[in-house]
Amino acid sequence: MIQQESQLKVADNTGAKRVKCFKVLGGSRRRYATVGDVIVCSVRDVEPDSSVKKGDVVKAVIVRTRRNILRKDGSSLKFDTNSCVIIDEKGNPKGTRIFGPIAREIRDRGFVKISSLAPEVI
């Protein structure tokens, strides 16, 4: 579960390495976000010559969490890191590559472009 002040790794090639969440979208008093939810975050660490700069406010979709993801068939899934992918206003990824596996719930939430760029969908 991701909440305000949570720090996440960035799983794409926009040049951002780490972001800090400061708002969970989807309700006036919503506190937590999980896989497939959109958050507003601030870029904390960047690589040189990146498309985003330190301090930029961006939207991102969460693709991996350390918290268990419970599925309807009774199985559960969790990852080693909390990670996100930076998106634009239309919901398309800003980067052209995605690193590491992502959860199947991303495709179910309508982020088909992100799931097609990912090397593995679990």
Swiss-Prot record:
Protein name listed in UniProt: Large ribosomal subunit protein uL14
Subunit: Part of the 50S ribosomal subunit. Forms a cluster with proteins L3 and L19. In the 70S ribosome, L14 and L19 interact and together make contacts with the 16S rRNA in bridges B5 and B8.
GO molecular function: large ribosomal subunit rRNA binding; structural constituent of ribosome
GO biological processes: translation
Pfam families listed in its UniProt record: Ribosomal_L14
Highest taxon of the lineage: Bacteria
Signal peptide bounds: none
InterPro entries with a match to the protein in the record: Ribosomal_uL14 (IPR000218), Ribosomal_uL14_bac-type (IPR005745), Ribosomal_uL14_CS (IPR019972), Ribosomal_uL14_sf (IPR036853)
Organism: Chlamydia abortus (strain DSM 27085 / S26/3)
Family the UniProt entry places it in: Belongs to the universal ribosomal protein uL14 family.
Keyword Cell division: no
UniProt keyword Metal-binding present: no
Function: Binds to 23S rRNA. Forms part of two intersubunit bridges in the 70S ribosome.
